[in-house]
A protein has these predicted regions:
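Catalytic core of DAGKc-family lipid kinases
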Residues: 1-65
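Well-ordered beta-strand positions enriched in small/hydrophobic/aromatic, beta-favoring residues
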Residues: 5-6, 66, 94, 131
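Short beta-strand-to-turn element immediately C-terminal to the catalytic PLP-Schiff-base lysine
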Residues: 8, 20, 69, 95-97, ...
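Histidine- and/or cysteine-centered catalytic micro-motif in compact active-site loops
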Residues: 10, 55, 64, 68-73, ...
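Glycine-rich phosphate/pyrophosphate-binding beta-alpha loops
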Residues: 10-14, 67-83, 147
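Gly/Ser/Thr-rich active-site loops/lids in small-molecule metabolic enzymes
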Residues: 25-32, 73-104
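Glycine-rich, charged/polar anion/phosphate-binding loops
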Residues: 35-39, 48-55, 76-82, 116-119, ...
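ATP/nucleoside-binding phosphotransfer catalytic cores, i.e., glycine-rich phosphate-binding loops
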Residues: 54-55, 60, 86-89, 96-168
Length: 168
């Protein structure tokens, strides 16, 4: 949608903490500032009804979190297995977490993510080049930790080798 990111585009649970933690808190507390901010989001955990199309596959339903990333760590709160993430493969990692039905399901989802068990039924992890997210809800995004307003349709495409780095 005309915006670029290098690290992560995300929506849902704990996404707000990436752009609402104050710079002073981040300077003083580092990673812990995000955790404190994220804890405040626990009471407002809610599903977002979306349709996600990724390289010809379609995922529909209620998700509490979604991310399109090129990293093993998302705000320090979510970790991806470094053996499954390649920075130079021309693909993003698409991570979707389905809305748990019960508190036990939520606990199991958190355990699965902590243990990097991506075969858990509430977890979708794919390597993709192109993603389209469609929703009728207000779905704010975070792009590399900066607030990005909701849009009914968000298109994300990996642009391999789009940036050229020079050494002096």
């Amino acid at each position: 949608n005309g915006r670029y990111f290098a690290y992560v585009a995300s929506f849902g649970a704990f996404t707000r903490s990436s752009y609402s933690a104050t710079q002073a808190a981040k300077n003083a507390l580092g990673h812990f500032a995000y955790i404190l901010e994220g804890l405040g989001d626990l009471d407002s955990l809610r599903p977002y009804r979306c349709a996600v199309e990724a390289d010809g596959q379609r995922y529909e339903g209620e998700f509490i979190f979604g991310a399109v990333c090129n990293s093993t760590s998302l705000g320090g709160l979510v970790k991806l297995d470094p053996a499954r993430v390649r920075m130079d493969d021309g693909k993003f990692e698409l991570l979707l977490l389905r809305m748990p039905k019960t508190a036990l399901d939520l606990q199991n989802l958190i355990t699965a993510m902590t243990r990097m068990q991506y075969d858990y039924p509430g977890v979708i992890l794919r390597h993709v080049q192109r993603v389209t997210v469609t929703t009728e809800e207000n779905l704010p995004w975070s792009l590399d930790g900066e607030y990005c307003p909701s849009a009914p349709r968000v298109e994300i495409e990996n642009l391999p080798a789009a940036v050229r780095l020079m050494r002096g």
